């Protein structure tokens, strides 16, 4: 197994991980920022006010993008297993 193959697998794994986690992270950041702005303007400092909307948003985004995430992760796993099978031969 050459260095190029290892680097390719690692690059695919990192890019897939970033791609799969991006929708949930971005939605949580946006909702957290909006709630923080709302809290700053109204001077409400309740900690659960930021937690509950982020939790609901992450659950909904996970529900709507879960199939796509699973498809990407299974594709990466299949590529890695095919690479392992080619190395063993």
From Swiss-Prot:
Domain of life: Bacteria
Bilayer topology annotation: Multi-pass membrane protein
Localization: Cell membrane; Bacterial flagellum basal body
InterPro entries (alphabetical): Bac_export_3, FliQ
GO cellular component, one term: bacterial-type flagellum basal body
GO biological process, one term: protein secretion
Transmembrane annotation, as ranges: 18-38, 55-75
Keyword Heme: no
Keywords associated with the record: Bacterial flagellum, Cell membrane, Membrane, Transmembrane, Transmembrane helix
The protein's role, per its UniProt record: Role in flagellar biosynthesis.
Assigned protein family: Belongs to the FliQ/MopD/SpaQ family.
Entries under NCBIfam families matching the protein: fliQ (TIGR01402)
The protein's name: Flagellar biosynthetic protein FliQ
Name of the encoding gene: fliQ
